Amino acid sequence: MLVLIPFKPVNPKTRLSKVMRKNERENFARCMLLDVLDALSSFDCDIKIISTHPFKIESYDVVVDSRELDDAINSRIEGETAVIMSDIPLINSRILRRFFESEGDVVIAPGRKGGTNMIIIRDRKFKVRYYYCSFLRHLEFAKSLDLKCTVFDSFYASVDIDTPDDLLELMIHGEGKKSYEFLYSIGFRIKYEKEPKLVRISNTFP
């Protein structure tokens, strides 16, 4: 299986800029990518990181493509292709095994806010359409092509990290992950209240 992982190494995750400096966001994005790659490490996949800028990571094939995400992905779909986002660090090999074994011409793991966090494409007629509630758009497109579409249900796969609120989920569930360790190292902690909150106790920001 071909696995494509989109990645933005330069000035990523701008919605986290209120709680992280630019260099911290870049390091954090890399840690999340490494968590995703760790989850994939036990599978015999052809992994390609589709990066918006030149970027090196040992033992992996990085392809630089500055086009819009849809174009960068659709031009590389071949045979059985999975697209896995680089900002879902809570996934693990057990989740991926269930995902890869799911039946269907198209298998979609939705994000919590209507996005598409993972997708398997087994029919080349299908093309990705990211953003603008891509989960529903992908369902509708598969239906229009008369393709069997399976929705893959996984909480951990649904947690993509974009906003400060998302960081709380990672700090609650992500112990042992590189991205969790990075957040902890720069002072993020959980404040135990009736509704847990995320606080930063060191390396005062900004």
From Swiss-Prot:
SUPFAM superfamilies: Nucleotide-diphospho-sugar transferases. InterPro entries: CofC (IPR002835), Nucleotide-diphossugar_trans (IPR029044). It comes from the Archaea. Signal peptide: none annotated. One of its GO terms (biological process) is F420-0 metabolic process. Pfam families: CofC. Keywords: GTP-binding, Nucleotide-binding, Nucleotidyltransferase, Transferase. GO terms for molecular function: GTP binding; phospholactate guanylyltransferase activity. Pathway: Cofactor biosynthesis; coenzyme F420 biosynthesis. It catalyses: (2S)-2-phospholactate + GTP + H(+) = (2S)-lactyl-2-diphospho-5'-guanosine + diphosphate. Its EC number is 2.7.7.68. HAMAP family: CofC (MF_02114). Belongs to the CofC family. PANTHER family: 2-PHOSPHO-L-LACTATE GUANYLYLTRANSFERASE. Guanylyltransferase that catalyzes the activation of (2S)-2-phospholactate (2-PL) as (2S)-lactyl-2-diphospho-5'-guanosine, via the condensation of 2-PL with GTP. It is involved in the biosynthesis of coenzyme F420, a hydride carrier cofactor. Homodimer. This is 2-phospho-L-lactate guanylyltransferase. It comes from Archaeoglobus profundus (strain DSM 5631 / JCM 9629 / NBRC 100127 / Av18).
